[in-house]
């Protein structure tokens, strides 16, 4: 899975154009969101998404592998716990969202260290997306 970071133009319909363009080209969105003009979406085929979006005139900032984790969701405060564990080791979360399977998607300023720190949250979900 890949996070695609795009800066939208401040025009009505940019999200529609984005979603329709990817859909016409067989790229599905597995999660994500838009924050002002900054969009982050999870896709299976990162390079294909980049190519389609660039050819369609979108401002693609980055395509990268995010950390994919799973919170047990048994009690309030679990997101705060994983965020605190990262912060305690000097890792900043740059982007956080969920996918359609309720995985926690994280982009950090140090993904290698973040992967080590968040190891306990991988054990919460053993599937093809968590590693």
What are these regions (language model features)?
Residues 1-131:
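A conserved regulatory-domain signal marking ACT and ACT-like small-molecule sensing domains
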């Amino acid at each position: 899975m890949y996070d695609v970071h795009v800066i939208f133009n401040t025009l009505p319909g940019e999200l529609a154009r984005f979603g329709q363009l990817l859909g016409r080209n067989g790229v599905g969105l597995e999660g994500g969101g838009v924050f002002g003009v900054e969009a982050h979406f999870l896709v299976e085929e990162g390079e294909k998404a980049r190519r389609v979006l660039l050819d369609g005139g979108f401002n693609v900032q980055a395509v990268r592998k995010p950390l994919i984790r799973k919170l047990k969701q048994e009690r309030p405060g679990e997101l705060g716990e994983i965020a605190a564990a990262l912060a305690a080791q000097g890792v900043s979360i740059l982007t956080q969202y969920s996918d359609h399977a309720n995985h926690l998607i994280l982009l950090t300023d140090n993904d290698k260290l973040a992967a080590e720190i968040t190891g306990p949250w991988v054990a919460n979900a053993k599937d093809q997306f968590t590693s």
